[in-house]
From Swiss-Prot:
Molecular function (Gene Ontology), one example: asparaginyl-tRNA synthase (glutamine-hydrolyzing) activity
Record family assignment: Belongs to the GatB/GatE family. GatB subfamily.
Catalysed transformations (reactions): L-glutamyl-tRNA(Gln) + L-glutamine + ATP + H2O = L-glutaminyl-tRNA(Gln) + L-glutamate + ADP + phosphate + H(+); L-aspartyl-tRNA(Asn) + L-glutamine + ATP + H2O = L-asparaginyl-tRNA(Asn) + L-glutamate + ADP + phosphate + 2 H(+)
Name under which the protein is recorded: Aspartyl/glutamyl-tRNA(Asn/Gln) amidotransferase subunit B
Enzyme Commission no: 6.3.5.-
Superkingdom of origin organism: Bacteria
Function: Allows the formation of correctly charged Asn-tRNA(Asn) or Gln-tRNA(Gln) through the transamidation of misacylated Asp-tRNA(Asn) or Glu-tRNA(Gln) in organisms which lack either or both of asparaginyl-tRNA or glutaminyl-tRNA synthetases. The reaction takes place in the presence of glutamine and ATP through an activated phospho-Asp-tRNA(Asn) or phospho-Glu-tRNA(Gln).
Annotated keywords: ATP-binding, Ligase, Nucleotide-binding, Protein biosynthesis
Organism: Levilactobacillus brevis (strain ATCC 367 / BCRC 12310 / CIP 105137 / JCM 1170 / LMG 11437 / NCIMB 947 / NCTC 947) (Lactobacillus brevis)
Single biological process term from Gene Ontology: translation
SMART domains named among the record's database cross-references: GatB_Yqey (SM00845)
Length: 473
């Protein structure tokens, strides 16, 4: 029996605003418990929320970035439920009039491109955080009221690999807008997953299960792969898949039953009475659209067509906005684009991985990287010398000053190199005889001796040219 899989993803993106969505409390990751709260966050009777205009703007930007239609006449709704981290006993969100709908992102899995639809996008407030210990439970309301955008996919995702690619594409586009850090490790991107399996040809969707504890894209894919196989095995054995919530165990790679869901939750949505409706003008949408930064697809196209990068190089450089912006700034300083791309993919990435830091947390600057690359391309230093220079610029040193202070300027003057070459040839007559007998390895030996005499500072290209001329006389 053959099966087809349907996967739905609900992604919560925390917006990078200075204050919360309905209160003036600051938004800051890692603050002391309940430090960033006020009476609105606590749900005191009689206090009134005020909509943060910046959050609405970010919602419009997200909709535009994901090719969605902006809902110009929208409002907020109350989603009613009781939980300790929700002191009002309701969440302010959007139900029937989300700020964006009918969008899409394009994914690429093994060279096959596919558009994944986005059903809708809601602006809403986050809840607080509960911490449970043996004898007590604690509530931290710092996160309460933090602005979120919930992005709900259409049932277009047909495999765990496609789910991973969708999340990558979504994160990338949102990150390039600058409205969120989209860091799962800090909670600014969270994913809820639904998956169902049905026999090929069956029109009705299978019974879905919800997966929890998915703290990385890798865990999302692994959890879906296990759950896909589990549901297939249940159906092949004649059983029926139950509507359940299951937890992914990262140690075993399995999903574990948490609870059986008897039916859909009833949150009794109704329009939020304390906030006015939102009327978004055409002019505001056009203004935000005009200010949108260049998206990754456009950047890749420009890198290939205008700067001569390969498709692969362009893809790697645009994995993050931080790396792409750094590349743009480096190339703007007249650095060779291909060399800049190679350094960012190679030495820079290796350095970041070794130090376990982001690019912005280092002392490396586009000015210093471009300066080093320009010293290589103009022949001032060799690629071998550049390794020392690279280490210096990661520590914040100016490349030109470092090269001059440490005597690393490459020796390229033929008038200074020729006597050294003559001395090496005089000291190695056997190598000259070997060369004349067709042994090409002799050239490598002689070059090595010349480099040794110059302490590695001779320009290899000039050395090779002068040496070959001398040998062929």
């Amino acid at each position: 029996m053959n099966f087809e899989t349907t996967i739905g993803l609900e992604v919560h993106i925390e917006l990078k605003t200075h204050s919360k969505i309905f209160s003036p409390s600051p938004v800051a990751y890692g603050a002391d418990p309940n430090a960033n709260t006020n009476v609105i966050d606590w749900g005191y009777p009689g206090v009134l929320p005020t909509t943060n205009k910046g959050v609405v703007a970010d919602g419009i930007i997200a909709a535009l970035a994901l090719h969605a239609t902006v809902e110009q006449h929208t409002h907020f709704d109350r989603k009613n439920y009781f939980y300790p981290d929700n002191p009002k006993a309701y969440q302010i969100t959007q139900s029937d009039k989300p700020i964006g709908h009918d969008g899409w992102v394009e994914i690429d899995v093994d060279g096959v491109k596919k558009k994944i639809g986005i059903a809708e996008m809601h602006i809403e407030e986050d809840a607080g955080k509960n911490t449970h210990e043996r004898d007590y439970s604690y509530v931290d309301l710092n996160r309460q009221g933090t602005p979120l955008i919930e992005i709900v996919s259409k049932p277009d995702i047909a495999s765990p690999a496609e789910a991973y690619a969708y999340l990558e594409a979504l994160r990338q586009r949102i990150q390039f807008t600058g409205i969120s850090d989209v860091k799962m490790e800090e909670g600014s991107m969270r994913v809820d997953v639904n998956i169902s399996v049905r026999p090929v040809g069956q029109q009705k969707f299978g019974t879905k299960t919800e997966l929890k504890n998915l703290n990385s894209f890798n865990y999302v894919q692994r959890g879906l792969e296990y759950e896909e196989k589990r549901q297939q095995q249940v159906l092949m054995s004649g059983g029926a898949v139950q509507q359940e919530t299951r937890r992914f165990d990262e140690k075993t790679g399995e999903t574990i039953l948490m609870r059986v869901k008897a039916g859909a939750d009833d949150y009794r949505y109704f329009p939020e009475p304390d906030l006015p409706a939102l009327n978004i003008s055409d002019d505001w949408i056009k203004e935000l659209d005009a200010a949108m930064p260049e998206m990754p697809g456009k950047r890749r196209e420009r890198y290939v067509n205008e700067l001569g990068l390969t498709d692969y190089d362009a893809m790697v450089i645009t994995q993050t906005k931080e790396m792409s912006d750094f590349f743009n700034a480096t190339v703007a300083l007249k650095a060779d684009p291909k060399m800049a791309a190679n350094y960012l993919q190679g030495d820079v990435n290796a350095y970041l991985n070794d130090k376990q830091v982001d690019l912005q947390a280092t002392k490396l600057t586009p000015e210093h990287l471009a300066g080093m690359i320009n010293l290589i391309t103009d022949g001032t230093i060799s690629s071998k010398m550049a390794k020392k220079v690279f280490k210096a610029i990661t520590e914040g040193e100016d490349p030109k000053a470092f090269v001059e202070a440490n005597g690393l300027v490459q020796l390229s003057d033929p008038a200074k190199l020729q006597p050294i070459i003559d001395d090496v040839l005089s000291a190695n007559p056997q190598s000259i005889e070997d060369f004349n007998n067709g042994k090409k390895r002799a050239v490598g030996f002689l070059v090595g001796q010349i480099m040794k005499q110059t302490h590695g500072q001779a320009n290899p290209q000039v050395v090779n040219k002068l040496l070959m001329a001398a040998l062929q006389q």
